[in-house]
């Protein structure tokens, strides 16, 4: 279980970081530039959100094959759209603020405004979203491993351990129960952490 935690948590962290980085950049561009840039990025995000992320990840994995690297790529490519929409919405609001207008008036470059002035104000929401996306990635890996297209031996993720233990479900049920319980505990822990951070970082909830 401890060894499998290394693989499962890595799968939770790395694709989440990559997908959120992609979504953040695209969301900033869509919200700040508007026009055709906004239209193209948001329509692409709508297409991604129209299908379950696990289904899209399955298509990518069936195309590329199993393995940890391909899991990283698949989960990174299919989970950026939600982040992009959130960052875009905040960018649309922030770019009308006085500090952004002041930066524009003195000739600050657009990319500098986006990453030095707007992005820091999006960080509280991104931190909360990050903690909530990690368990989603862990569950996606477990589902892909259950279907035989996720982590492959000799890797030992919790998802793969649970799948390989199902052969002995009646004689040695702990082989599947233990990694499944580990997944459940970690997912719940990250969800509670995300809820707590949202309560702390959301100024509206603070006022309440």
Regions found by a protein language model. Name each.
Residues 19, 23, 27, 31-35, ...:
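A short glycine-centered flexible hinge/capping loop motif at secondary-structure junctions
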Residues 8-23, 50-58, 120, 124-141, ...:
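Hydrophobic alpha-helical transmembrane segments in multi-pass membrane proteins
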Residues 61-63, 75, 90-91, 139-182, ...:
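Glycine-rich helix-loop "coupling/hinge" segments at transmembrane-helix boundaries
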Residues 1-10, 14, 34-42, 92, ...:
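Amphipathic cytosolic juxtamembrane alpha-helices at the membrane-cytosol interface
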Residues 28, 57-62, 71, 75, ...:
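Transmembrane alpha-helix boundary and packing residues in multipass membrane permease domains
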Residues 18-93, 127:
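Generic hydrophobic transmembrane alpha-helix motif, especially the helices
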Residues 61-64, 68, 75-78, 124-134, ...:
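C-terminal transmembrane helix and the adjacent membrane-cytosol boundary/short C-terminal tail
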Residues 1, 37-44, 48, 158-161, ...:
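Hydrophobic alpha-helical segments of integral membrane proteins
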């Amino acid at each position: 279980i401890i060894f499998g935690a290394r693989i499962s948590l890595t799968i939770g962290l790395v694709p989440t970081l990559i997908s959120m980085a992609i979504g953040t950049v695209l969301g900033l561009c869509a919200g700040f530039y508007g026009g055709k840039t906004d239209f193209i990025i948001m329509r692409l995000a709508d297409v991604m959100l129209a299908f379950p992320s696990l289904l899209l990840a399955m298509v990518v994995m069936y195309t590329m094959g199993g393995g940890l690297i391909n899991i990283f790529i698949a989960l990174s490519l299919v989970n950026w759209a939600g982040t992009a929409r959130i960052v875009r919405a905040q960018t649309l609001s922030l770019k009308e603020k006085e500090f952004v207008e002041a930066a524009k008036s003195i000739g600050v470059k657009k990319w500098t405004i986006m990453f030095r002035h707007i992005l820091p104000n999006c960080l509280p929401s991104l931190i909360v979203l990050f903690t909530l996306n990690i368990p989603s990635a862990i569950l996606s890996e477990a589902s892909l491993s259950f279907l035989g297209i996720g982590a492959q031996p000799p890797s030992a993720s919790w998802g793969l351990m649970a799948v390989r233990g199902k052969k002995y479900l009646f004689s040695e049920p702990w082989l599947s129960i233990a990694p499944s319980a580990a997944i459940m505990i970690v997912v719940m822990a990250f969800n509670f952490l995300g809820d707590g951070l949202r309560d702390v970082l959301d100024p509206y909830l603070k006022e309440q």
